[in-house]
Regions:
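A Zn2+-metalloprotease active-site environment signal
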Residues: 1-181
Length: 181
């Protein structure tokens, strides 16, 4: 799945940031240090994207993108390592693939509920309840995936020799950025 979506995902995020090849090499170098600590050896690939939005993402199979907007907000290499460690866990654990699979299953459940309740006077209520249930289930799994990525990402960060405090300063940066919205 990751390989199939990788090119399209990069293009949708503004394309590769080709102005500074040294920056791309630096990000890949830090990423590869952390990937070496990962529990799953994948052909990790790190790319800097020409997008001003502070964000990073991972696809199954080890494809990881970091927006240049996020790089501008980071204060240290350790914070970059914290971001990349987190994304490595998402890629290694297949969180993206699991979310897509869950989404397809939940869509099927909603469709089945819609068809089954079609002739009932309570069809709107049944479909609404199924939709809310699906949303709550998806949020729980998303929260668990984030906690897993935070936990193992911290382990990889420390194993690679970075200061674990960077995870805290990175979270403070994310809080500051979210307050600006």
């Amino acid at each position: 799945i990751g390989e199939e979506q990788y090119f399209a995902s990069r293009q949708m995020q503004g394309g590769d940031f080709v102005v500074d090849p040294e920056l791309a090499a630096y990000v890949a170098s830090v990423g590869n240090e952390l990937a070496h600590e990962s529990d799953l050896a994948l052909p990790y690939e790190f790319v800097v994207l020409n997008n001003s939005v502070p964000n990073a993402w991972a696809l199954p199979g080890g494809k990881i993108g970091v927006n240049r907007g996020l790089l501008l907000e980071l204060d240290s290499e350790a914070e970059l390592a914290a971001v990349l460690g987190h994304e490595i866990v998402h890629a290694a654990a297949g969180h993206g693939a699991q979310a897509m699979q869950r989404g397809m299953i939940l869509q099927g459940v909603l469709l089945a509920t819609s068809v089954a309740a079609q002739s009932s006077e309570y069809s709107g209520l049944a479909i609404g309840a199924a939709g809310i249930g699906a949303q709550l289930l998806n949020q729980r799994y998303s929260r668990n995936a984030e906690l897993e990525a935070d936990g193992y990402g911290l382990v990889y960060l420390a194993a690679a020799g970075y200061d674990p405090q960077a995870v805290i300063t990175l979270q403070e940066t994310f809080v500051r950025l979210s307050e600006g919205k």
